[in-house]
Amino acid sequence: DGLIEMDGMKKRTITLADSHRADRIPVVGVVTAGVPILAVENIEGYLPWDGEAGCFALRVRGDSMIGAGILDGDRVVVRSQPTADNGEIVVALLGDSATVKRFRKDGNQIWLLPENPAYQPIDGNHAQIIGKVKAVIRTY
């Protein structure tokens, strides 16, 4: 499936392929990649998304996940789910604050790990997993 279509019978007829095919997902605010900040869920707009249902997007603020390729200003697409497996990148709620980190469980201890040595791991035992990061969207 291509992104453009051409009519071989006509000259200069290039059109977008079925642009209605992709679903849209809401951009619902900001999540930090650094020190958690207050989580306020406001729909700021929509992004096209041709992936699975149950996803939303968040803007990233901070640099704690640069080692995972998630930069300040990126948007992360998140699948809503309350659990995570070791090594997955998640969005977690800590009280009223949301953060994006790598999930790790060691026995009964849950850690939310940054991907930048300038930041410390966060004790995640009282965190609520909001979802798993499925994609990173960067605009230049």
Go through the PLM ranges and name each one.
Residues 68-140:
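C-terminal regulatory/effector modules of DNA-binding transcriptional regulators
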Residues 1-71, 97-98, 105-109, 120-122, ...:
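Short, positionally conserved secondary-structure boundary motifs
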